[in-house]
């Protein structure tokens, strides 16, 4: 019955409102206002949490978040922290204000990320994702190069390589060439997909690996 009315917002959905007016003095008449709608939307709900990742320096892996609910335009702000518990700063890089983010990968180390999600219209609570870890590791490198072999027929000498760093499972494929510069093909024999390879020695000659 007042000139200002605060519509209930406890029930999700759309309700139509109007105000009726009446002047008790004779001849002043009565009537009603235009109809207006009040739409109550559910709060933002995170349906897909971002997943942490481990990659080599200069990688381009992405993290993604998805939500439902909210009212009006939904905004996203990825944030980064050195420890995941203390201070948070707005992140930089491709997609830092979108649902899909590519964290910087030029600096080796561990950093922690989360996303702040807000709806443009009033009344919707801010949503914050879980904290995820991003590990940037040094690129794969060879610390021990294979060395040449000179052996007799039916010898069992091995070629050996040692690697360091990298991310995930390291795979090895030994290759052979008749001249060391071209026509490289995958080698066969014991250990051809491991760090320790025993090249075939059933015929004389020189091969490159």
Question: What residues fall within each predicted segment?
Answer:
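Surface-exposed, proline-enriched loop/turn segments that connect beta strands in immunoglobulin-like
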Residues: 47-52, 144-148
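Core motif of extracellular immunoglobulin-like domains
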Residues: 18-19, 65, 78, 114-115, ...
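Extracellular interdomain linker/stem segments of modular secreted and single-pass surface proteins
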Residues: 39-45, 135-141
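Surface-exposed, flexible coil segments in extracellular/virion-facing regions
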Residues: 1-9, 80-105, 176-200
């Amino acid at each position: 019955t007042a000139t200002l009315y605060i519509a209930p917002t406890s029930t999700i959905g759309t309700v139509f409102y109007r105000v009726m007016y009446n002047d008790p003095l004779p001849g002043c008449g009565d009537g009603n206002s235009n109809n207006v709608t009040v739409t109550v939307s559910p709060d933002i709900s995170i349906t897909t949490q971002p997943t942490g990742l481990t990659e080599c320096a200069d990688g381009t892996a992405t993290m993604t978040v998805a939500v439902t609910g909210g009212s009006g335009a939904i905004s996203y702000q990825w944030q980064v922290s050195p420890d995941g518990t203390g201070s948070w700063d707005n992140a930089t890089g491709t997609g830092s204000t979108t649902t899909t983010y590519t964290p910087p990968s030029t600096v080796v180390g561990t950093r922690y990320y989360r996303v702040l999600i807000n709806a443009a219209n009033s009344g919707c609570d801010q949503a914050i994702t879980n904290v995820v870890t991003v590990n940037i590791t040094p690129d794969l490198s060879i610390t021990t190069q294979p060395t040449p072999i000179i052996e007799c027929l039916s010898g069992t000498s091995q070629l050996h390589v040692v690697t360091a760093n990298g991310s995930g499972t390291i795979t090895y494929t030994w290759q052979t060439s008749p001249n060391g510069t071209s026509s490289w093909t995958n080698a066969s024999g014991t250990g051809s997909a491991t760090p320790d390879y025993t090249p075939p020695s059933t015929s004389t000659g020189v091969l490159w690996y």
